[in-house]
């Protein structure tokens, strides 16, 4: 006989666990896949592993509702921003943080090139709440001035790589525990990243 309580509990745990959505690169275009998972607070954690048979031109609007952390673990890429005379690039071993600007971005993935990116998008209201909960006003002003008005780069550290390696373990937890573990790793990565940005670019009181 099936225990209905345990059956329902198991179903609830599964349905309330973080769900990873994976999209494969079309076979006629190349190899690889893009996967993402969303935390309870709306942060989006995604992996981009791609190798296209030929140059792939992509364009899209950078959403103003998020601040993004982009990590490049293999071949780099550059992109242009509409209405701006600037070209942004990121190379292997680099990462950058910036707020979406609501403008069109244009980039080209070179063919027969191995791309591996990890991306974390944090909703702006959530990001502001984190700053207000944990930092003094002077620190908040310094971070916002630097992070919300341009693009800051820092090198990927071994500890950042360690956090990403652990982040995948959220699948070992069911229900709310999975979300809690995932959120904790996003927090940990953000704290390490802000520390790197502050020591590299900011002079905080």
Predicted features along the sequence, with ranges:
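Alpha-helix initiation and N-capping motif
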Residues: 3-6, 124, 136-137, 160
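Generic surface-pattern signal
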Residues: 11, 15, 132, 136, ...
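Intrinsically disordered, low-complexity, positively charged segments
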Residues: 18-20
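Short Lys/Arg-enriched alpha/beta "domain-start" segment
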Residues: 1-15
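N-terminal regulatory/effector-sensing and dimerization cores
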Residues: 22-139
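An amphipathic alpha-helical interaction segment
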Residues: 120-129, 148, 155-199
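Short, cationic low-complexity segments
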Residues: 96, 140-153
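Conserved small/polar residues in nucleotide/adenosyl-binding loops
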Residues: 200-205
């Amino acid at each position: 006989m099936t225990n209905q309580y345990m059956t329902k509990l198991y179903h609830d745990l599964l349905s309330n666990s973080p769900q990873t959505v994976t999209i494969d690169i079309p076979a006629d275009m190349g190899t690889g896949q893009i996967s993402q998972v969303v935390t309870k607070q709306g942060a989006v954690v995604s992996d981009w592993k791609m190798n296209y048979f030929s140059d792939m031109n992509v364009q899209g609007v950078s959403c103003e509702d998020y601040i993004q952390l982009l990590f490049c673990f293999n071949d780099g890429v550059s992109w242009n921003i509409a209405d701006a005379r600037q070209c942004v690039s990121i190379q292997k071993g680099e990462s950058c943080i910036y707020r979406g600007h609501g403008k069109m971005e244009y980039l080209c993935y070179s063919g027969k090139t191995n791309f591996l990116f990890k991306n974390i998008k944090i909703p702006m209201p959530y990001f502001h709440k984190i700053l207000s909960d944990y930092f003094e006003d002077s620190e908040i002003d310094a971070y916002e001035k630097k992070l919300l008005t341009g693009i800051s780069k820092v090198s990927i550290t071994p500890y950042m790589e360690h956090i990403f390696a652990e982040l995948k373990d959220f699948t070992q937890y069911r229900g709310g525990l999975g979300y809690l573990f995932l959120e904790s790793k996003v927090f940990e990565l953000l704290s390490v990243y802000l520390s790197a940005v502050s020591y590299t670019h900011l002079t905080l009181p």
